[in-house]
């Protein structure tokens, strides 16, 4: 019989033991018996006597195997990305060949071979490290990197449970020693700026300082990834910075982002059980690029893809085939048992359940996958941003053709102004404007009450689907020099620096808006200086250092400056429009600087309204009143004579159309109010002209 401890020599000693009230017997060779009885625990009394023999029951081969299975510190704190790449757990990396090649070049160096990936959040820095792991797994790397393994270090786990002084340094030293021994390991540290200051407390060394000597000599290799803003923390420590070689990661173009999504869509289709059409892939990129301004491609496009797949997956009444098959087997057994027991009622119920389950299983197998289309992506963008993307995308070409007619319906008597605005917007939508300039920048000049603000509201409704898409700033709030800072936020060191600017933050959140600055001549001249850059380059930097794009906004400023001045023309001149425009610019030059006026796409003069225009405006105002009454189930009928009388009563050459609203309130709405209070069961109102006076009749 062989020895139960070494399994090699013949057993010569039979040993009987009782350990913790359990009787055990084993056979040993003389060598193993002498080895076990010499252990110090043998002299520590009967309870500890059995301890070495308890271990003796385990074969030496097994204990050696356990030693080999024991993982090092690196395996506890880091994850092997290369193994994940070999197992197919990593998404394919597309369009980043140049960056991956640059990383491989740096890793191939003799010293300071530590690349750090720097770029904005969401541009794909971690994906480049995963791309390197895929290339290593495929063997598509130089000979020096053939057998390398890429480990992702968890910095939080590195610092955890190191509360006692010296524990962190000891753990770092152990990690560095292990990395020096395992020459085939490349350490990837995401958010590498966390190394600066990690683990330091009251004079102890931080992770960055501990790693410096090993990084400089090339004893271990590290790949880092961080954002531009957070890389400054590493730049403060010049000695640490020089040990890293920066690799800039730029945001991919729209074409590259589409290729990236087409490459990874198979993974998302398999996960969600849906299919993505090519139009949906394109919509993910184009819509996220256009409407989600504060994030970067391809991350924001992948988020849309994932969310659309998730939403479509929830609509599928999915049946698990394995569970259904197991239940069918169980039903068959239960049905057989019920028949044996002559329980025919239960057997009939089980038969019905079996038929229903088979039918559902067959329909599930024949079920075609749900396809995600571009419309689904539009719905998600609308939910995330609040921008009516569907309205903006639908029949845009037709909408642009009809823009001028739609504006004329609401803005009366300003044909030239409406025509100029419509032309500028159509030119922009056709892609003929400068890439970064706003859609249009206009200065509306004219007397009060002629439709300057109304044109802005109508334009917002036609362009962006809602009249609420207006960011309106009252220039009377910006008459003082110090108030100008409210537009972009207070500078550092001043109260309110943490708060966002009134204009920049609104445009950042709602880039598709009309910015309306009423009575611009009231504002301090510094406001004009601030808008010089917006109208020229379509961008403005707020007090937090964030650049806000105005390329999707329409800038409209209104002014009464010079509206009351008329110049007499002397002599003969065929082109009156040239003289009028020159006269207008000359009068505005008294209030605004030439460089400010020169940046507008168009300076539009609004004419004073004539009596015939006021009748149309009365019809519009009464139409609004009719809609209000319709909500209460009351109809309204107004004769043409009554409309003309209202226009006559409300006409004032200096005040424009605003007196009309007051006239309607005085002659129509007040009469209706009295009638409603006297008789609550009114179904219709008739406004007529009787004895040259406006009368309201109720039915």
From Swiss-Prot:
Describe what happens without this gene.
Cells lacking this gene display a retardation of CtsR-dependent gene induction as well as a delayed restoration of the repressed stage. They also show a significant delay in disaggregation of heat-generated insoluble protein aggregates.
Zinc finger extent (C4-type): 3-32
> What turns on this gene?
By heat shock via the relief of repression carried out by the transcriptional regulator CtsR.
| UVR domain span | 325-360
Q: Does the keyword Transmembrane apply?
A: no
Provide the record's note on post-translational modification.
ClpE is a very short-lived protein, that is, at least in the soluble cell fraction, degraded mainly by ClpCP.
Q: Is Secreted tagged as a keyword?
A: no
Q: Which UniProt keywords apply?
A: ATP-binding, Chaperone, Metal-binding, Nucleotide-binding, Stress response, Zinc, Zinc-finger
Task: Summarize where ATP binds, as residue positions.
Answer: 119-126, 446-453
- TM spans, by residue? none
User: What GO molecular functions are on record for this protein?
Assistant: ATP binding; ATP hydrolysis activity; zinc ion binding
Task: Indicate the family of this protein.
Answer: Belongs to the ClpA/ClpB family. ClpE subfamily.
Quaternary state and partners of this protein? Interacts with ClpP.
What PANTHER family does the record point to?
ATP-DEPENDENT CLP PROTEASE, ATP-DEPENDENT CLP PROTEASE, ATP-BINDING SUBUNIT CLPC
Biological role stated in the UniProt entry: ATPase essential both for efficient CtsR-dependent gene derepression during heat stress and for rerepression. Together with ClpP, degrades the global regulator CtsR after heat shock. Is also involved in disaggregation of heat-denatured proteins. Has thus a role in overall protein quality control in response to heat stress.
Q: What's this protein's name?
A: ATP-dependent Clp protease ATP-binding subunit ClpE
